Amino acid sequence: MTIDATRKSAAAAQSNYSGQQPDLAKAIGWTLVSVLTFALTAWAGRECGKHMTAMNMVFYRNFISLIILLVAFWWLGISLKSLWTERPWMQWGRALVHFAGQWSWMTALLLIPLIELISLEFTFPLWVALLAPLLLGEQLTKPRVFAALMGFAGVIVIVLGPTVISGGKVAPSFSLGTAMALSCAVFFCFNMIGTRYLTRYDSALTILMFMVVNHSVMAFVLGYQTLKMPQGTLWLWVMMLGVCSLIAHFALAKALVYADTVVVAPLDFLRIPLMVALGVVVYNETLQPIVLVGTLLVLAGNGVNIWQERKRKVASSAPTKAGAV
């Protein structure tokens, strides 16, 4: 095989399903947009939560996204029939799991400090690393187990650290909000595994449409008794909630078009300092050093997981001796 042929083969392997070639600058740009809009989603959710329940926020968040998507599809001439799937029950099942995760996240958002929420939420890649081998047949490696143990040690530090440091004067921070944050991480884990499976057969738009329709219907059915029309400036926060969450998911998907997950994921961790800053500056939340230590352990666990994934991809893409002739 010639050098030129090898280069062309490598470029073809790096090219993704959309036909786009890797572009680091665009990947970084879209990831930063995602990081910012996810933080704005949390801010809007906190403000909306002063006037409505978490279930109502899930409804407005997804109903607004649904309207935007339908208008965009009409404008672009995309037929809804083209978004249908031969696996509707699996799509609904995945969407239902994500609905539970989104509701848990919204509930935790109203109950615990933002640094605790974002730190516990970011344990979901570690759950994926442990459970994907069981559900998708991926390899369970020692680095994956080590990464998960580091992350879960971080969770223990976040929950029990303040109690240990104070000599028992401060009660453990495990509460309904903490339970909801951990629950959302587990639900997001199963959602990620389901998405990995479904993307083998369906487009991202199909998955997104099933999600927003499912969430809008479920949230309305479960929360219609407390559902109220937003009044005054609350409309601005509700619109911000729906628009920013849709932009965040779209931007993250676009980032993955131009770069692999092992490139995008470390940049996504910028959400942690941004959420911490939001909590401290806007809501006067206290930043406890021991909680920060737990957060760093979660980050370290994710870092090991990303390093292992990068190493695996490099090994799998390396040409064999026979192929290099």
What are these regions (language model features)?
Residues A12-S18, L66-E86, V155-V170, H215-L236, ...:
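Membrane-interface helix-cap regions at the ends of transmembrane helices
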Residues M1-W30, A129-L182, V186, L299-V325:
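Juxtamembrane helix-loop boundary signature in multi-pass membrane transporters
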Residues T2-K8, K26-A27, H51-A100, F187-N191, ...:
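Transmembrane alpha-helices of multi-pass small-molecule transport proteins
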Residues P125-L149, T226, P273-L292:
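C-terminal transmembrane-helix exit sites in multi-pass transporters
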Residues K26-S34, S79-S104, S175-C184, M229-I247:
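Loop-to-transmembrane-helix transition segments
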Residues L117-T123, L198-N214, H249-V280:
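Helix-helix packing/entry segments at the starts of transmembrane helices
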Residues N56-F59, F63-I64, L109-G137, T261-L278:
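Specific alpha-helical transmembrane segments that line the substrate/conduction pathway
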Residues I165-L227, S317-V325:
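Transmembrane alpha-helical segments that form core, pore/gating elements
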